[in-house]
A protein has these predicted regions:
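Helix-loop element at the rim of GNAT/NAT acetyltransferase active sites that forms part
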Residues: 1-11
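Intrinsically disordered, low-complexity linear regions
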Residues: 29-30, 59, 70
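Conserved acetyl-CoA-binding loop-helix of GNAT-fold acetyltransferases
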Residues: 47, 53-66
Length: 157
């Protein structure tokens, strides 16, 4: 399933996969790659074509991330970046990503060039980062402007 969708074949470690099973058939798969530099990357997300648009991917991601307390990165096509915001993923510059994630990003960009010559659809890739809930809350609190106190109303003369 992962190979059939032409996803990044590096870092596939089958024990790390979560699969969605329906009536004994695997209809989806996703993993968190654990890189040698300590970074972790959500990847190899795939759902069988006849089960797409039914929430299979969302349920797998919900389950996979529910107990995560460490930062996680992912590489996705630009049109899909906003979809992952619901799980706390935010777009970052490639230079801000860990070395191994940047390496996978570069592999993906090279694959795009091959796609161009094979006349396959090309999509721009982006890197997303998901911080732990505690750190996300702190960052959002710092970004939020201070509340403005309402002025006391005085009766008109």
């Amino acid at each position: 399933m992962v190979r059939a969708e032409r996803l990044n074949p590096t870092g596939i470690h089958w024990p790390n996969f979560m699969v969605a099973d329906m009536a004994g058939r695997i209809v989806g798969a996703v993993q968190i790659r654990k890189h040698s530099d300590g970074s972790r990357e959500l990847g190899s997300l795939v759902v069988a074509k006849d089960h797409r648009e039914h929430g299979v991917a969302s349920r797998m991601i919900d389950r996979l991330l529910e107990d995560e307390r460490e930062p996680i990165w992912m590489i996705t096509s630009e049109p899909y970046a906003e979809v992952y915001a619901r799980w706390g993923f935010e777009r970052i510059e490639p230079s801000a990503a860990p070395v191994k994630v940047r390496f996978n990003y570069r592999i993906g960009r090279l694959a795009r060039i091959v796609s161009f010559f094979r006349r396959l659809p090309m999509r721009r890739l982006v890197i997303l980062e998901r911080l732990p809930v505690e750190r996300r809350a702190g960052i959002k609190a710092r970004r939020r402007p201070a509340p403005v106190e309402p002025m006391a109303s005085t009766p008109a003369a």
